[in-house]
């Protein structure tokens, strides 16, 4: 097998027993694909599909004027080029976007002609605002911040049938309902009430009898009954009543009379329930009519209008209940036969018939008016308005759209064959929904499960952006329609008709302030990936936290392989925000689907099919871990399978599909937890959430016990530099990597040089540090997709969120009580958990009413010392070390002119005009921050003169750009000439300077002539002459292009910045803060085992083993049993084995053993013990590569134990044995303070520990003096306000309990809100007198005022 550049350097031993059938797909595909479909930027305008922007334009255009004499048609759209690149946008606080230009055509028709003759056509490109572009990593830069648009899981459009679970009515009766949900438009609900009448609601308004809707659709009462009921014929004679007998309809009824056959034999006795046996006898006896007593017919309903044949008048309307009078009337009218509705209580209820009786309307118009009244109460209805409203509700394309998904779901649910159709509803659609609802109420069919993933779909970025864009276009449409009528007369152009502001505003609002447009979580590469793969049920058109019940949040069987059952936040959002499973993707309809291998006749094939939750339940699907033989046949007689959302056992021959991988169930974060299968789900949830909070450490350290997913996450997250093309490394420094591309990957006319600029010490959204470090050296060969530089939390191309620490599970003097963690001082000395945080502090100079603020080093009443770190422009130097309270940017603000006292006037008169009054409003370092200034950026308003510092920064940036571009040209030039040299040498020349005709060109010849003269050389072979001309032309073009790029950059830097109104200048100062680990910091493992550091002990006091090696971290063993996360113990054992093997390899390297011996030992580790599916091909490694591999393994042999397919206990023991370590994983430890051995052996090993972004430095602060609340005059709370610690109700009770009266008085008065007491106390302390005189607390005055506001007067009486 082929190894990538980094894999060769450090192979991870894989314990997986199952073959890797399918590579993990690109993890950001859901974001990138969705937005690519939205913009279709890579397709030519005429080949664009009807999706995304194209669909939005097509749905709104053409816009026709009210008179119909003018129309505006859409032709195509084009996306421009972004003004700034991503990094410039972040720096300037701009949005990374491209201008959208739309080509539209204005057509004016001739008014006079009868047929629509075209009078005039004008075509023009119109600017339609900017469309934010997605960066390569699936994020958006909006106003300078990186944001992510989270996908939304919402209810799919379509029709749903459900019941209220008996909650509505006290009797507990199930009330069924049906709901038609469109993609946009009014919702239509049908529902039963406790009396079994059917009602309809539109948009959840007041309910009306369902028959009103049917009447409004143009159905008469007779047609309604005919559609929903079967009829029975009744023959009416003078003395008897006979019923046409359909035996099957009698099933389950209790007879009130005897039923006899033609011969008079009794088939069913009186009072018996009719069974299937009776029905068979009746069918045999060929009885067609049955004489029934009159009572049988009473209470039934007529199926048709009964009409007097002579006069034609309606005697009895259909649906009339049959009473004695009705029977008499029928007999007297000589009606011999009529039809009644066939109903019974079992499977054919009289619901619609009963509803029709309560319906007050008689005609279609009355029904329309009734609906109008319900939708628009208080407005007088007219025939036209009522018809128009009803037409627009469900039958107009503008107002109603089921969408392709909705139509597909709708037709499938109603059992129709075709999956496509109109986006609007038809009469038949509504009738079918009602019919299905009634049959469900009759006990035929089942209700839907709304939490089934076949009924919930994912709306990704592209789709949401398209919806917002359409909203903007619809607003534009209204304005355009009004202007179009003017266009006919005034000869306007399309430009004058379209105002793009509403579109731009809608798009901007969506990206800037939608609930689903979130500030990207950029703690580490994993948190970025997880954020982009998140699926939220909240947001516009989704659920709200308060309303979401338990069922929506719960894990559903259809989540298997689509949504992770583990990773979800704890707290109010649990279950509403989920993460996509590793292999899941969305299909064209937006439903999540998961890959499966096809199984044919018990043999597993490599053919992979994606199944959505809708299709999955009908198949029999085996687990990925099902046993197979060498040919892929299932070996077990009974295989554990999933079928119809249940787990069951089936014969091997019945299996139709098989899972692709055991980790397809979990998300990326959960699949990074080793031994996940041994952890309790709640702890695994915490583990996967806490990995996202790990802060990138100064030196990344790969986990020795991993899962094999680390490489995928690092590669796909976008924090590393990945080679676009293969080749050789030309040069490397800390800031850039230059690759000379291999010939086979270089297209003709390309210089074949790739230059990668690295990101250095940049601030992330979470104030952590983003920095890339090259891992390749000059001369290294690389191929496409190899990792060239590690990003934050990446080590040799693998995700490395924390550090491998030597830990012991034991108690130690109570320092690890309640999950506390005891840490050795060695961890601090080695900077294992030292992290760099970068803070951005901003100083803004504004234009105020009293004059403009000024950034200057001339600050009133500030000593020389405080200004030492500022330059002449008043801005701090880069590299200065600053602490709390230091000035970073000097700024003065004009003060209001105060009224002068006579004395001041006199002084002014004597000493002349004093400097204008300004106050110091400089930017200072916040309390508890100490760091180094690493960068300063100055932005000046366009039109203002730049200060010296801005000019210096600008010059430095320009020099850097010029240097980069020259370097780039030099490299390209070198590569070009090297290529030419290889082509020319050895071939015959025909003319040129320094060469002789007919001679073969040599290296010496070429070295002798000037490079510019190379192009003048003519060769005998014309192909070579062409190559020379092409190369010359390319170099000229490249130079030109680089010069243009330089000029462009220069222009951008020279023009002023576009700042907010009233802002003159912005200075941004970036501070790098180094944070060592200290007591109070939060740490965690990957198994949900979190704790706070209680103390940092000297190394000599820590427990140590027989070899004198001390422990780094001591954890509490009581944290394991109750939490049931045993994975951490297995990780500790395997970590110990890994480090032990590393130590053995280290010794072999130090002793300079034979390479063959090393090779054999490595083979033993990788290919003998715990032999997985993957066999490492060490024979393909050269001796140098084996030696380099061995050197990289000295710190521990990395292991991969995948979720549900990991290392077995026996394998861990075998590796411990190979490493010459005790198989129990326990060893005797000695107390560092006394040297005595502890009572029993202790579990010692290596665990991967993370430092979480909950640092004590960010949380702890102390208040000395600070601001007070305005009304209560009590100190504020919280770190941001520099607030105090609240002495609350319970604390007061504690002091009361101790009887500490004076302390309590002090707390409630001078230390809180006794204003006069505070001042007096301050004076006393200044005078050296430490007495306190408490006064009246301000909060008491507030209470008095509040009581007075109720009209009760309270006054305090003075004690005389």
UniProtKB/Swiss-Prot annotation:
Show which residues constitute the signal peptide: none
Q: Which PROSITE patterns match?
A: RNA_POL_BETA
The UniProt keyword set, sorted, is: DNA-directed RNA polymerase, Nucleotidyltransferase, Transcription, Transferase
Listed GO MF terms? DNA binding; DNA-directed RNA polymerase activity; ribonucleoside binding
SUPFAM superfamilies, per this entry?
Answer: beta and beta-prime subunits of DNA dependent RNA-polymerase (SSF64484)
Q: Name one Pfam family in it.
A: RNA_pol_Rpb2_6
User: What's this protein's function?
Assistant: DNA-dependent RNA polymerase catalyzes the transcription of DNA into RNA using the four ribonucleoside triphosphates as substrates.
Subunit relationships: The RNAP catalytic core consists of 2 alpha, 1 beta, 1 beta' and 1 omega subunit. When a sigma factor is associated with the core the holoenzyme is formed, which can initiate transcription.
Q: What is this protein called?
A: DNA-directed RNA polymerase subunit beta
Q: What is the lineage of its organism?
A: Bacteria, Pseudomonadati, Pseudomonadota, Gammaproteobacteria, Cellvibrionales
Provide the gene name from the record. rpoB
